[in-house]
Amino acid sequence: MPIFKCPQKSEPLWKEWDQKAQKNGLRHQVFAVNGDHYVGEWKDNVKHGKGTQVWKKNGAIYEGDWKSGKRDGYGTLSLPDQETGKYKRAYSGWWKGDKKCGYGIQFFGPKEYYEGDWCGNQRSGWGRMYYSNGDIYEGQWRNDKPEGEGMLRLKNGNRYEGNWQRGVKNGSGRFFHLDHGQLFEGFWVDDVAKCGTMIDFGRDEAPQPTQFPIPEVKILDPDGVLEEALAMFKKTKEEGD
């Protein structure tokens, strides 16, 4: 008696190819049609886990964490130097949704860099900025500019401590003229001191002290005069806004 066997069902060839094309786990190297290439881990056909991406257009290299196809977690971005061709670190820190977010260090030049908080690719929160001219700003940031309480220490040792808005001195603050041994305390509007008081401060230790000390203020109520002037400037500023 003949024995009949059911023929085995085979999947279409296109489906087999599609399964082989699905990317999961570690892949040695995957090239995109635009020339970019990626080496690292995948999940459900997208970059996920540890990996390195190289962009052909600008030569940038990112090494670090990925999540759902985007830079997410800790990673380092490097860019080629236009003159030497050697790679230089541009940013090391945390990412979220393909943008700098959390603590990180951004290098703007050989002697200029920022270390601190980021949000949506912008400096936001607390941070310290080292400028190429030797100045250092340390304090609060918002929308990629100093905003809130902060201190700017100049190369010569003089410093400003006080309020900032839109990247410049705005509001109450103190400026220490340590080279001349004086301290100015007052109110700033758009980086210009509008009113305040100047006193001697560390004049004996100053490298270039003023010729004569500042005489004692004879106003009966200097604090009251300053408060009145501040109120006037604040009112004028509010009306202008």
UniProtKB/Swiss-Prot annotation:
<feature type="region of interest" description="Interaction with TP53">
    <location>
        <begin position="206"/>
        <end position="240"/>
    </location>
</feature>
<feature type="repeat" description="MORN 1">
    <location>
        <begin position="38"/>
        <end position="60"/>
    </location>
</feature>
<feature type="repeat" description="MORN 7">
    <location>
        <begin position="184"/>
        <end position="205"/>
    </location>
</feature>
<feature type="repeat" description="MORN 2">
    <location>
        <begin position="62"/>
        <end position="84"/>
    </location>
</feature>
<protein>
    <recommendedName>
        <fullName>MORN repeat-containing protein 3</fullName>
    </recommendedName>
</protein>
<keyword id="KW-0677">Repeat</keyword>
<feature type="repeat" description="MORN 3">
    <location>
        <begin position="91"/>
        <end position="113"/>
    </location>
</feature>
<dbReference type="GO" id="GO:0001669">
    <property type="term" value="C:acrosomal vesicle"/>
</dbReference>
<feature type="repeat" description="MORN 5">
    <location>
        <begin position="137"/>
        <end position="159"/>
    </location>
</feature>
<feature type="region of interest" description="Interaction with SIRT1">
    <location>
        <begin position="76"/>
        <end position="100"/>
    </location>
</feature>
<dbReference type="InterPro" id="IPR003409">
    <property type="entry name" value="MORN"/>
</dbReference>
<feature type="region of interest" description="Interaction with MDM2">
    <location>
        <begin position="6"/>
        <end position="35"/>
    </location>
</feature>
<comment type="function">
    <text>Assembles a suppression complex (suppresome) by tethering SIRT1 and MDM2 to regulate composite modifications of p53/TP53. Confers both deacetylation-mediated functional inactivation, by SIRT1, and ubiquitination-dependent degradation, by MDM2, of p53/TP53, promoting a proliferative and cell survival behaviors. May play a role in the regulation of spermatogenesis.</text>
</comment>
<dbReference type="InterPro" id="IPR052472">
    <property type="entry name" value="MORN3"/>
</dbReference>
<dbReference type="Pfam" id="PF02493">
    <property type="entry name" value="MORN"/>
</dbReference>
<comment type="subunit">
    <text>Interacts with MEIG1. Interacts with TP53, MDM2 and SIRT1; the interactions mediate post-transcriptional modifications of TP53 by MDM2 and SIRT1.</text>
</comment>
<feature type="repeat" description="MORN 4">
    <location>
        <begin position="114"/>
        <end position="136"/>
    </location>
</feature>
<feature type="repeat" description="MORN 6">
    <location>
        <begin position="160"/>
        <end position="182"/>
    </location>
</feature>
<keyword id="KW-0968">Cytoplasmic vesicle</keyword>
